[in-house]
């Protein structure tokens, strides 16, 4: 993974070269490359591109075949997706345009409190009395954070309150796709244990979560699954296929 900024093509080439080096492979060993994410059209060496919604759904169903509903919470969007019994997308909903329904909301809240994104999980973990953040706009949330601080609320309680707010929005989005178990949670924001715990508490039923930092790679892994299938279908007889996928992660 690499921070891309606006240099999406450069970032995609960088992570692709690094992946080849780590795998001990050459470019010619890769039969098919799929670009996904917001920068998918900027991946210069791709064979084709797919939406991150499709890729994340495929990644979720690959790891957890019983998945029927996927919640994908990333830095830019929140997506709820219903799948059929073979992992195809039946319906989906995205959050409203405002960043309050995305990881950017938590990043901005942390910044207002004087913390980095990497500190969010540890900060929220020591909260004792979460302070609700009622604002529906990540930009206007700054004034609400300042107000809570002036009233004596701790940064930890404000941070956890922001997570509670984000979880409430995610559950509402899931209801709009007529959610049903099994649920699978993906996206970079699912790195924060307190958010995962709250979502599991709200949903009930079977909730699947990839371990460690893997939730943020679900779309890339799903693209790899699609790439392998397409690479195998197009391979010449007798050729050994080592296929992969390219995914661009845009850091906000």
Where are these regions (language model features)?
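Phosphate/pyrophosphate-binding loops at sites that engage ATP/ADP/AMP, CoA/4′-phosphopantetheine
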Residues: 16-31, 170-181
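Short beta-strand-loop/turn "lid" adjacent to the catalytic site in phosphate-handling enzymes
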Residues: 1-4, 22-54, 81-82, 87-90
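Glycine-rich phosphate-binding/hydrolytic loop that grips phosphoryl groups
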Residues: 103-107, 211-247
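Conserved phosphate-binding/catalytic loops in two-lobed NTP-binding clefts
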Residues: 52-53, 199-221
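Glycine-rich phosphate-binding loop plus the immediately following alpha-helix
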Residues: 4, 88-129, 225
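Gly/Thr-rich phosphate-binding beta-strand-loop-beta motif of the actin/hexokinase/Hsp70
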Residues: 67-88
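Glycine-rich phosphate-binding loops at beta-strand->alpha-helix junctions
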Residues: 38, 175-202, 214-217
């Amino acid at each position: 993974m690499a921070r891309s900024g606006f240099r999406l093509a450069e970032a995609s080439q960088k992570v692709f070269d690094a992946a080849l080096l780590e795998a001990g492979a050459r470019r010619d060993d890769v039969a098919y490359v799929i670009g996904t994410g917001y920068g998918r059209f900027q991946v210069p060496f791709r064979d084709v591109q797919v939406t991150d919604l499709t890729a994340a759904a495929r990644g979720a169903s690959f790891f957890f075949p019983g998945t029927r509903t996927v919640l994908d919470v990333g830095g830019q969007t929140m997506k709820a997706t219903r799948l059929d019994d073979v992992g195809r997308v039946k319906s989906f909903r995205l959050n409203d345009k405002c960043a309050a329904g995305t990881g950017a909301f938590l990043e901005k809240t942390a910044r207002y409190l004087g913390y980095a994104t990497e500190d969010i999980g540890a900060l929220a973990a020591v909260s004792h009395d979460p302070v609700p953040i009622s604002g529906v706009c990540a930009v206007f949330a700054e004034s609400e954070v300042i107000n809570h601080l002036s009233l004596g609320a701790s940064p930890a309680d404000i941070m956890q309150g922001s997570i509670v707010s984000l979880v409430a929005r995610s559950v509402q989005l899931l209801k709009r796709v007529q959610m049903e178990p099994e649920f699978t949670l993906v996206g970079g924001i699912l790195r924060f244990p307190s958010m995962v715990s709250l979502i599991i508490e709200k949903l009930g039923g079977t909730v699947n979560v990839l371990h460690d930092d893997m939730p943020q790679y679900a779309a890339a892994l799903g693209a790899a699954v699609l790439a392998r299938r397409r690479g195998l279908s197009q391979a010449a007889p007798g050729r050994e296929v080592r296929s992969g996928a390219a995914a661009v992660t845009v850091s906000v």
